[in-house]
Amino acid sequence: MTATLIKNIGKIYGIHDKQFLKGSAMSFSGIIENGYIVIENDKISSFGPMDQAPENVGNVIDADGGLVMPAWCDSHTHIVYAASREGEYTLRLKGATYEEIAANGGGILNSAKKLQQTSEDDLFESASLRLNEIMASGTGAIEIKSGYGLTTEDELKMLRVIRKLKENSPAVIKATFLGAHAIPAAYQDNRNKYIDLIINEMIPKVAGEGLADYCDVFCDKGFFTTAETDIILKSASKYGLKAKIHANELANSGGVQIGIKNKAISVDHLERIGDEEINALLSSNTIPTVLPSCSFFLNIPFAPARMMIDSGLGIALATDFNPGSSPSGNIPLLMALACNHMRLTPQETFHGVTINGAAAMEISHSLGSIFPGKIANLIITKKIPSLDYFIYAFGTNHISKVILKGKLLHTY
């Protein structure tokens, strides 16, 4: 395969071979100014100062002074859904809470009702449009959850759509089974029967078709208890599905501790945690993942990411792209929110959506930084001075080109 040279790069960001960055290391700044990168066989083969760039390379992309960064790694999304929920948005503007809307049949149950009426082909078509949109904004790896089916067949339908996206997209995709997203209306008076369905029917069928990498549970006030979460995750583990958890979004639910107990790859949300949860995370290998776009959209507290990093934790940041609480998969916007509302530095935010986001999907050995042998998922910006400027001047598209698996995907 012909090699590709990216030349005249103003600054290369994210140069390192680490697989996860914690605490003060999240401020690490591996930069080359006036550099080049060579891609061969869809992977980064070399990089360095421009005056050391090889000659006579077959394909040449001129960065024209722009920045080059690893493509974003978004480790928490729900992009397979049937319909938007802007009606609930206007209800919240009038004073209704997320919990009140959910209790009245809105929220997740609203999405489930619409998804159950939508064909697999239509779900694939709409999810493909969303995936293409976020790839164009620089996302090259993504985790996608089920959870709007809430019946065995509809959960399987969602996961088959995710598998089809994986087969037809240049993005690296991880799939998560989230049957324990909410208790369906038909089981409101017998929640144990639904949990039995998850354990005895859904999980075996999901695993039998090889449709998921992970099993997630919404462990929070009004959804699933810690005891229920523990049972579900233990059952999933027997079938080879690793744990992830929605935890501590609405209350101090105990979800962090139950995630750690079940060796969760990540615990996500964390808007309502304190010293106890932070200390527990420090003693574990579970990755805390924060979702600033959700806090912004629901107007709820932001996770204490600053305190977490200052305590020595590494964090991932993800969009939580979904129709109800975060209808955006735009990572550049997320980065501005994280800096402004969580008081993170641009470098910390950058590592949260690159190497640490990759780690939360167990792919940081091949993605999330710029280093020889890693997959060439890259963003080339327009001619701007720095990463700081990229985040500071929010609302403007600073991206010029997106390269996924070594191929030019999108040019502005």
Region locations from a protein language model:
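N-terminal metal-binding scaffold of metallo-dependent hydrolase/deaminase domains
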Residues: 1-53
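Metal-coordinating catalytic core of metallo-dependent amide/deamination hydrolases
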Residues: 111-126, 132, 140-254
